[in-house]
Amino acid sequence: VDLQGQGPAAVIAGPPRSGRSSALVTAARSLLDRGTPVLVVTPRRSPLRDLAGAPGVLAVLDGNARSVTGGGADDFGGLPGALDPLALVAGHERYVVAVDDAELISPDSALGLALDEILRTGRDGEHGLLVAGATGDLATAYRGFAAEARKGRTGLLLNVQSPADGDLFAVRLPRGAVGGPPGRGLLVVSGTATPIQAAVPD
């Protein structure tokens, strides 16, 4: 998915164990391999936390904007030890923020508002946002960064459970889209769906 062309955001959605975190790790590693810095946000345990300390990874934050590796002297949003995502990306024109389990981040929290600002400025900048989460929860998000990310109608819909899952991207799903093994789903680009099998990281 071209975040510059279809972005500045893409959504990876599916039920638990559908491969959405693996797809997000694969996307993050692909970006890092191309020299694009990545800021990772993971409110709960996620394979993305393994990227901490990797070259090009600006930081790996939890749902309270604290580094998962410890440290950090800021008090972002009034939380001791929390880091300001906007400060972490400052000085980088090109970067991507990868957020796993996005539905767990309140749109009204300091972190949620910072992610919203990153998405808003990405429309005219060279940075983007990759958001992963549960299909149902993301489909019912009506404000904040997750709702704004959906508006581009671009991303992955993994392990489709029902035709209503297409509501996330405001698309009608093709027949036979329901079911399949983990990683099976639809690539949706600007509202057009194509069947895919997501790659898994090495």
PLM features: residue spans?
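Phosphate-binding and hydrolysis-coupling loops of NTP-dependent motor/remodeling domains
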Residues: 95, 132-133, 139-202
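P-loop NTPase catalytic phosphate-binding loop
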Residues: 1-153
